Regions:
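An N-terminal assembly and electron-transfer interface module characteristic of large anaerobic redox
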Residues: 1-173
Length: 173
């Protein structure tokens, strides 16, 4: 947009990590040439505290992930930073931006990744890998049989900014 039309813009994704959310707000207000509202600093501090409080609760917990409305690799980078261990990630694509988050995930663990979010064949992996949680789409019947707790983030399409961090932490904790 900037190069072609001279229009500045910010890619404001549904990030989970407080630092990335705060950076997006800073870029937005810089482009608008407006001061960053003070309440954003407070929300940022709240999100950092909420994330830190989640670490002892989530540390070591394993999960599978189906596709979500969130920025998938960023979400998993955030969750691994909290100490969670993804066993299998179902992700539809890998963009250039995702590469940094993929590398962050690999500093914590090396999960299986499948491009197809095909619940049919993947249902057989619940009793084998035994994840504590399934975040996003999945086979509810097989999860129940395997003792995997289903976590749905139904509000993901309706939130942005620090609300994403709040939703993620509340849904999983």
């Amino acid at each position: 947009m900037k190069r072609k039309f001279g229009t500045p813009y910010v890619v404001f994704e549904r990030y989970s990590d407080p630092n990335r959310i705060y950076q997006s707000y800073k870029e937005l207000f810089e482009i608008l040439e407006k001061p960053l509202p003070e309440k954003l600093v407070g929300w940022y501090q709240d999100a950092k505290e909420r994330s830190e409080a989640a670490k002892p609760i989530l540390g070591g917990k394993t999960y599978f992930s189906g596709n979500t409305a969130l920025c998938n690799y960023e979400l998993h980078s955030f969750l691994t930073g909290l100490g969670m261990k993804p066993l299998l990630l179902q992700i539809s694509d890998l963009t250039a931006q995702d590469e940094q988050w993929r590398k962050e995930i690999l500093t914590h663990c090396d999960p299986y990744v499948t491009r197809a979010a095909n619940i049919g064949p993947l249902q057989y992996l619940y009793p084998v890998l035994k994840p504590k949680f399934n975040i996003g789409a999945g086979n509810a019947k097989e999860m129940k049989t395997s003792g995997t707790q289903m976590i749905r983030m139904m509000q993901a399409y309706n939130v942005l900014g620090f609300e994403v961090n709040e939703m993620v932490c509340e849904c999983i904790c």
